[in-house]
């Protein structure tokens, strides 16, 4: 009986080693090294194989860490950093985008409100009164007049407009509105036109800024 058990043990070790090779250890095992535990998932069978961790390309085999648990601590730092850092970069960009959209959303609630010279809301607005009011809804303070807004913000190219940017129109930046995305602007034009949303082409473009 003792001899029979030894034969079974040898057969098991050979089967486990063959399974590890089938997962991707196709190259010859490197020079003698510290033995690593190789596990056959779901069987409770394991065996120590010297030098298997040094097999070229072994780390690239999908799921190899389930067979050789010690490899789970050897993940490539660059790949790990890419997975961890990518969401962080997106998270950093999110506040600016959400703030711009919040400005647009605030302005959009006032569509249909009457124009009033010098009015800053909440029931009537002139052009720069609307932009100032919408920005104040997200905690931002900007200059009061259209010319000052156009002069003091960070210049933005027409092709780089984002929701919430302030767009100036006409010579001298005498009129401003809030870029609402998709080529449109929300603005308070004049006493004969209630606060509305129009195409950017509705008026001659002067410049655009971002605060």
From Swiss-Prot:
GO annotation, biological process? proteolysis
Q: Which UniProt keywords apply?
A: Hydrolase, Protease, Secreted, Signal, Thiol protease
Cellular localisation: Secreted
- Where does the record locate the signal sequence feature? 1-35
E.C. number(s) listed in UniProt:
3.4.-.-
Question: Which Gene3D superfamilies would you find in this protein's record?
Answer: endopeptidase domain like (from Nostoc punctiforme) (3.90.1720.10)
One protein family per Pfam = NLPC_P60
Under InterPro entries, the record lists: NLP_P60_dom, Papain-like_cys_pep_sf, PG_Endopeptidase_C40
Any GO MF annotation of the entry: cysteine-type peptidase activity
Instruction: Using the record's annotation, list all stretches that form the NlpC/P60 domain.
Output: 97-211
Q: Which SUPFAM superfamilies match?
A: Cysteine proteinases
What residue ranges are annotated as transmembrane?
A: none
Query: Which GO CC annotations does the UniProt entry carry?
Result: extracellular region
Where's the active site on this chain? 127 (nucleophile), 175 (proton acceptor), 187
Q: Does the keyword Methyltransferase apply?
A: no
Family the entry assigns: Belongs to the peptidase C40 family.
Q: Which PANTHER family does the record cross-reference, listed alphabetically?
A: NLP_P60 DOMAIN-CONTAINING PROTEIN-RELATED, PEPTIDOGLYCAN DL-ENDOPEPTIDASE CWLO
| Stated name of the protein | Probable endopeptidase cgR_2070
The protein's organism comes out as Corynebacterium glutamicum (strain R)
